[in-house]
A protein has these predicted regions:
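Active-site-adjacent structural elements that line small-molecule/cofactor binding pockets in enzymes
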Residues: 1-187
Length: 187
């Protein structure tokens, strides 16, 4: 069940961050419903400090608090800008409720990419991945290079500091080149 999996994830984050934050030479102990750790030397430590924990999801209650407590980055993948904005606001409120500066968190999203030189190119790429152009325009990064740049600027205005782009047709290298040459230099 989802609730139980979320409980397990919460404990996993408590354990891993507890291990990472235990000073060298000290031991870490944890006793929870799903995990018990006794006298762990809490080694090795991660190279990055703080470790880049990414918490993602669209759950309106528990996810924002989990992100506020543990994440370096919050990600809501494959949603529209409005849903992204609403969820980020919940995360900011959760940060404030536990005394964390909401600006200490990075906010990101993930989108499916479908960029083409013209409408026919876009439609061909959407069909190749079994998706509808209109759905991709709503929830993805879809359109001409100019439209993609505008869409990324809208995401940025909504608070996205980082975007993860997903190419579903891994054989279409021209698609990757198009994004790299005509979109990315301008955002």
């Amino acid at each position: 069940p989802l609730g139980e999996r979320f409980d397990i994830l919460t404990e996993q984050l408590a354990v891993i961050t507890g291990l990472w934050n235990t000073p060298n030479g000290e031991q870490f102990n944890y006793s929870g419903k799903h995990y018990t750790i006794s006298n762990s030397p809490a080694l090795p430590k991660p190279v990055q400090s703080p470790p880049p924990i990414i918490v993602g999801g669209g759950g309106p209650k528990r996810t924002p608090l989990l992100a506020a407590r543990y994440a370096a980055e919050f990600n809501i993948p494959f949603s529209g800008i409005e849903r992204f904005s609403e969820q980020c606001e919940r995360v900011r409120a959760a940060c404030t409720s536990i005394g964390r500066d909401p600006q200490s968190l990075q906010y990101s999203s993930a989108v499916v990419v479908c960029v083409g030189k013209n409408d026919a190119d876009i439609a061909r790429r959407a069909a190749a991945i079994g998706r509808e152009v209109e759905e991709l325009r709503l929830n993805g990064l879809c359109g001409t290079p100019g439209e993609a740049i505008e869409r990324l600027q809208q995401w940025n205005a909504a608070g996205a500091q980082r975007m993860y782009v997903q190419f579903l047709d891994l054989t279409d290298l021209e698609h990757l080149d198009l994004l790299a040459e005509q979109v990315m230099p301008f955002v």
